[in-house]
Amino acid sequence: MKYKLALVMSVLCAFSAWTEAKVKLPAILSDGMVLQRERPVKIWGNADKGENVTVVFKKKKFSTVAGEDGKWLVELPPMKAGGPFEMTVNDIRLKDILVGDVWLCSGQSNMELTAGRVTDKFAEEIARDENPMIRYVKIPLGNDLHGPKDDLPGADWMSLTKETAPSFSALAYFFAKEMYRETQVPVGIVNSSWGGSSVEAWMSEEALQKFPRQLHERDLFNSDEYRELCNRSGQMMNRFWDTALYKGDRGLHDGICWNRPELDDTDWQTVDMFSKEWGRKNGYPVSGSHWFRQKVNVSAEQAGKEAVLRLGCMVDADSVFVNGISVGNTFYQLSLIHISEPTRPLY
């Protein structure tokens, strides 16, 4: 009995050691990725220290050994555009890899804005797009004041299809299509953007040395305690604002809710929407909620069909009701509401 137990434990220990030695790749090195053509390409990851790592790509082998910190890296030589190819990294198999031009797209909300929010003007184009030679990956939002991250979970590649096109950055979508039209080689878009972010937030500590004030701010945010204090303060202010906005909104508490069609609005003022003064009081803008009501006539032929409501640029958010039914809302300016399949008839 003792002999059998020792044998089983030996096997389990060996299995445990084997599983721990498994090579790991960052999320961005995955199925469907695009590698830069005609330039050396780095492939990297993690494993147990001293682990042998072999990368096989286009029938060529590239080997290395994981260092003391478990990190490893191999460099592929410059390659011509083409694909799709497969790659193996020890026991990991990656499929549908292209070699072409890889572009980093970064910026604020103008780069984050998705193609799905410009379908009003480009609906037919976006709905019919299918190009497996165009790939896209959006880097998930996140920050780390202690240095670059080894991995970014959720950074998954997608091909351009009519289903995925609305998820693309609108700017990157049209850019990628134009680049492919010009070059006829695979195009990979890496979208690392964050609305409202300052350029200093993207700079390294070394790059900030010439900017003392921004460097001081960075040093402050290096403190986990300071960041936690800022987060708590921000959450508290948001709760205060949300509560004050809700309690102070007469449209929600003055008898019949102002989104109801039976509301008597005869004492409401008529507003000149092209005037800059309707949202101001004593020369200053009024922060809070503004309610508008508009009656429109819908023909029998139009009734029951899908429709699009264009409100233009709304700052900062809107909620829309038709005959008392919520048909959509927008957070952040461009308001384009598609009215379809309501829970009950609108007309």
Predicted feature descriptions by range:
Residues 337-347:
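Single conserved hydrophobic/aromatic residue that forms the stacking wall/gate
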Residues 141, 149-156, 160-164, 224-307, ...:
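Extended carbohydrate-recognition surfaces in non-catalytic/accessory domains of CAZymes
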Residues 44, 268, 296-324:
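Aromatic-lined ligand-binding clefts that engage carbohydrates, nucleic acids, or primary amines
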Residues 21-49, 95-105, 112, 272-283:
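Non-catalytic, glycine-rich low-complexity segments
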Residues 56-59, 90-91, 321-327:
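Short strand-turn-strand beta-turns centered on an Asx-Gly dipeptide
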Residues 66-75:
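Glycine-centered loop-to-beta-strand initiation motif
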Residues 1-22:
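Bacterial Sec-dependent N-terminal signal peptides
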Residues 82-91:
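Short, aromatic- and glycine-rich surface loops/edge beta-strands on solvent-exposed regions
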